[in-house]
């Protein structure tokens, strides 16, 4: 179906499906969660473990895992997850390829015919992080040695070279160092004056809390070794003292460790259907920690799974709209290829409502006005090149990508609105049908011109869940 003002569709081959991973459907115990996060594909709100998939999925908003850190499966009817982000390009320069995937997730069914739960669908596209690859440069010859770094005793001298024979390109560099140094001797002795090394750490106080009998003290020391003064020629000694002492101030009273009181009563189950959590609490007050004593070890609360054994209501969900019916006008055999407006309709089904859940909101039937151009010969014009499509097959040998130019029909200049029933105002009219466009021959073709290219540096398709094991 072509509507007025719409762009010509791109021709894409279907992506390849592979790697089946079937979720738990039996009675083996699983980890049960309150919800499934669509954006990340992760389970959220742990209820607990040791329950069957059937009990966990009494509430279709819940989700489960067969093991900690494993694949999260929602309890709702199966559907495709969101596409993952594109993986990094397979090469860092020039043209490469990159992959992304989505998975069939849910419980007790299939995403579509022959597409089981856990199935991965892959997409592959070309990518280019950097147009050119780095080219290494070459060094010039070494320059002359610079003067010695000191005027007495021994020092170092340096010489340099430039990375310009040739210069690197596209982010490249020259291997090795741009300068080198060597020792040099002035044959002149220098006096070395003494300097203190850093203070050592304070020794522990003689007491850690108030005792009422003495004032604890702490001491630290340092050495005249950074450097030591020279003997010939003589250097100056370090000024000041090598030791210092101070009183320990602000010491606290001796600490008292805290201890837990008894567990309180178990709270009621907070839900009326599916699984919930009950809670017990205790207080760190037997005794309360004092004067910096440690708090009670362990948790102040603990939870237990409670099972109502009652299924939760499941709201109905609209299925996809069906195809538009043929554009017709009452009491007329055919209105195709004529400036005569008609009507067409499409339907949808409310599916999945259970246990007194809400019915689907909105209308089951959609009606619109239309002009029929089914099988009408129309003058056409060639479209611009479409964007490059995905690489097909994404996980098979020798994937290719394609783009097309299409013979697009020029729609008749019929009125865009009509008044079908007096008093109901103007209604928009849509062109419907598959016309027969006619374009001048292009590259030996009359309807579609296609160009194909191979996809380069293709990475392997690997299940991200298997890489975690």
Swiss-Prot record:
Show the segment(s) annotated as Interaction with Complement C3 beta chain.
Answer: 351-359
Where is each TSP type-1 domain found?
28-76, 77-134, 136-191, 193-255, 257-313, 315-377, 379-462
- In residue numbers, the region (Disordered) covers 218-238
Q: Which Gene3D superfamilies match?
A: Thrombospondin type-1 (TSP1) repeat (2.20.100.10)
Q: Spell out the disulfide connections.
A: 32-56, 43-72, 57-75, 89-127, 93-133, 104-111, 132-170, 148-184, 152-190, 163-174, 205-248, 209-254, 224-238, 269-306, 273-312, 284-296, 327-370, 337-376, 350-360, 391-455, 395-461, 407-439
Where is it located? Secreted
InterPro entries in alphabetical order? CFP_TSR-0 (IPR049536), CFP_TSR_C (IPR054019), Compl_asym_regulator (IPR052065), TSP1_rpt (IPR000884), TSP1_rpt_sf (IPR036383)
Annotated coiled-coil positions are: none
What does the entry list under GO cellular component? cytoplasmic side of Golgi membrane; extracellular space; secretory granule
UniProt keyword list: Complement alternate pathway, Disulfide bond, Glycoprotein, Immunity, Innate immunity, Repeat, Secreted, Signal
Please explain the role this protein plays, according to its UniProt record: A positive regulator of the alternate pathway of complement. It binds to and stabilizes the C3- and C5-convertase enzyme complexes. Inhibits CFI-CFH mediated degradation of Inhibits CFI-CFH mediated degradation of Complement C3 beta chain (C3b).
Per its record, how is this protein called by name? Properdin
Protein's organism:
Pongo abelii
Classification lineage: Eukaryota, Metazoa, Chordata, Craniata, Vertebrata
Q: What is this protein's gene name?
A: CFP
């Amino acid at each position: 179906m072509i509507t007025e003002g719409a762009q010509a569709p791109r021709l894409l081959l279907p992506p390849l499906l592979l790697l089946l991973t079937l979720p738990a459907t039996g009675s083996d115990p699983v980890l049960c969660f309150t919800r499934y996060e669509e954006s990340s594909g992760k389970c959220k709100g742990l209820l607990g473990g040791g329950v069957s998939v059937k009990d966990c999925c009494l509430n279709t908003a819940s989700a489960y895992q067969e093991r900690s850190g494993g694949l999260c499966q929602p309890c709702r009817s199966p559907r495709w997850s969101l596409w993952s982000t594109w993986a990094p390009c397979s090469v860092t320069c020039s043209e490469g390829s990159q992959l992304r995937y989505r998975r069939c997730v849910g419980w007790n069914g299939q995403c579509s015919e022959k597409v089981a739960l856990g199935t991965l669908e892959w997409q592959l596209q070309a990518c280019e992080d950097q147009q050119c690859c780095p080219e290494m440069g070459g060094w010039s010859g070494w320059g002359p040695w610079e003067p010695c770094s000191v005027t007495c005793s021994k020092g170092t001298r340096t010489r340099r070279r430039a990375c310009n024979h040739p210069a690197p390109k596209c982010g490249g560099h020259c291997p090795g160092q741009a300068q080198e140094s060597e020792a040099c001797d002035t044959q002149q002795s220098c006096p070395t004056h003494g300097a203190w090394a850093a203070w050592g750490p304070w020794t522990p106080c003689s007491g850690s809390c108030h005792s009422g009998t003495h004032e604890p003290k702490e001491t630290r020391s340092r050495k005249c070794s950074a450097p030591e003064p020279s003997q010939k020629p003589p250097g100056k000694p370090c000024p000041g003292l090598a030791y210092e002492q101070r009183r320990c101030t602000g010491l606290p009273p001796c600490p008292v460790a805290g201890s837990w009181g008894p567990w309180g009563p178990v709270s009621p189950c907070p839900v009326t259907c599916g699984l919930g959590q009950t809670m017990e609490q205790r207080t760190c007050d037997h005794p309360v920690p004092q004067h910096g004593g440690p708090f009670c070890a362990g948790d102040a609360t603990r939870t237990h799974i409670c099972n109502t054994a009652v299924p939760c209501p499941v709201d109905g969900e609209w299925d996809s709209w069906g195809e538009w019916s043929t554009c017709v006008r009452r009491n007329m055999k055919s209105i195709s290829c004529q400036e005569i407006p008609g009507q067409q309709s499409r339907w949808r089904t409310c599916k999945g409502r259970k246990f007194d859940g809400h019915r689907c909101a909105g209308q089951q039937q959609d009606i619109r006005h239309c002009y029929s151009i089914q099988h009408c010969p129309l003058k056409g014009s060639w479209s611009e090149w479409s964007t490059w499509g995905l690489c097909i097959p994404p996980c098979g040998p020798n994937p290719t990508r394609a783009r097309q130019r299409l013979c697009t029909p020029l729609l008749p200049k019929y009125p865009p609105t009509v008044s079908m029933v007096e008093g109901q105002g103007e209604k928009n009219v849509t062109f419907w049908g598959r016309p027969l466009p006619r374009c001048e021959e292009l590259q030996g073709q009359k309807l579609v011109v296609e160009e194909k290219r191979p996809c380069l540096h293709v990475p392997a398709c690997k299940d991200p869940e298997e890489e975690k094991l």
